[in-house]
Amino acid sequence: MASSRISLRLVRRFASAAADGTTTAPSSGKISVSKAKSTLRKEHDPDKALKIYANVSDHSASPVSSRYAQELTVRRLAKCRRFSDIETLIESHKNDPKIKEEPFYSTLIRSYGQASMFNHAMRTFEQMDQYGTPRSAVSFNALLNACLHSKNFDKVPQLFDEIPQRYNKIIPDKISYGILIKSYCDSGTPEKAIEIMRQMQGKGMEVTTIAFTTILSSLYKKGELEVADNLWNEMVKKGCELDNAAYNVRIMSAQKESPERVKELIEEMSSMGLKPDTISYNYLMTAYCERGMLDEAKKVYEGLEGNNCAPNAATFRTLIFHLCYSRLYEQGYAIFKKSVYMHKIPDFNTLKHLVVGLVENKKRDDAKGLIRTVKKKFPPSFLNAWKKLEEELGLYSKTDAFPSSAKEAAAA
């Protein structure tokens, strides 16, 4: 409760600054928006995230970075179901003089979508006349994105048809069509997405590589390999700019075939002048893991740096899971420590297997150390499952009690 009061004070002070026509920090600890963006990527505590965002010295210095920082802050709050704080934060921006600028206004619609608060996003879109903000495909796309992020996949086509009829200045562009295509793919109907793509082609509109790749991914996931391969060939014929995302979708499918096929595609990427990334190598590592070839998988992991890549959360999650599956818990714990150093700690379900395995193998100190580390890295609202696991395994003690506030967690 105390942390929530602190958050509301920060938000209200930020709102006052916006009303005064400034976006300066409410406290003396000013930071640049770029620094805030970088720090927020590593910060999971919603109160700390809110404080970082509120202390940005000038949100107008980099609008793109500012939008990203705002969306990260909203996601941290949403993870803890702090919807009231999210509403207060986003509504505070409606006092900003830039509210009449459509790109600025659209960030508010998008942010509500990041929190799956679609009704708020819709209301904000409908309020644009009230604030004297013009509408175009920019705000329309923000609304479609908010709907998509809120997982209202069936509503996206409805909005796509209805909104341009209500507001004649809104003309869907290739981004609008791309969002519509993604909504069909996310709902498991790539065949409808292909129909939309054909409509675009009939109108002479560019079908972006992103749209092609989205359909390709959905087809591979449904096991429609022949249709997917035909679409890939069409992309090549039409001269689409094949990028990492497009190749990684093919690699995702190839991992089910064999590690050798994945390696072939990685080599093909390189021959096309593309640089395989962490996602590419994660699929290769997964292909080895799923076939019990852990030594080969570890070589891929250890070779990431040499390939100018850094492990991400999926890298650590995959490797730790399969090491635990093979009962190699000490190796899993070593990988966990690296994930902490990289600020890429895997999810609870992955680490639960590791903790249980460490305890079963009489590595209780390591198990307690892992849980102690997690306590320091995440806010108390994230830790209920960990507390329950501690008690079940007999690891819980009063001296290791979970912090009752974010402040205590930071001091732990």
From Swiss-Prot:
A GO CC term attached to the entry: mitochondrion
Molecular function terms, GO-annotated: mRNA binding
Subcellular location: Mitochondrion
Ranges of the PPR repeats in the UniProt entry: 101-135, 136-166, 173-207, 208-242, 243-276, 277-311, 312-346, 347-377
Keywords: Mitochondrion, Repeat, Ribonucleoprotein, Ribosomal protein, Transit peptide
Transit peptide residue numbers: 1-14
InterPro entries in UniProt: Pentatricopeptide_rpt, TPR-like_helical_dom_sf
Biased composition (Polar residues): 21-37
Region (Disordered): 21-43
Family listed: Belongs to the PPR family. P subfamily.
Subunit structure comment from the entry: Component of the mitochondrial ribosome small subunit.
Name this protein carries in UniProt: Small ribosomal subunit protein mL103 (rPPR7)
Organism, as annotated: Arabidopsis thaliana (Mouse-ear cress)
Lineage: Eukaryota, Viridiplantae, Streptophyta, Embryophyta, Tracheophyta
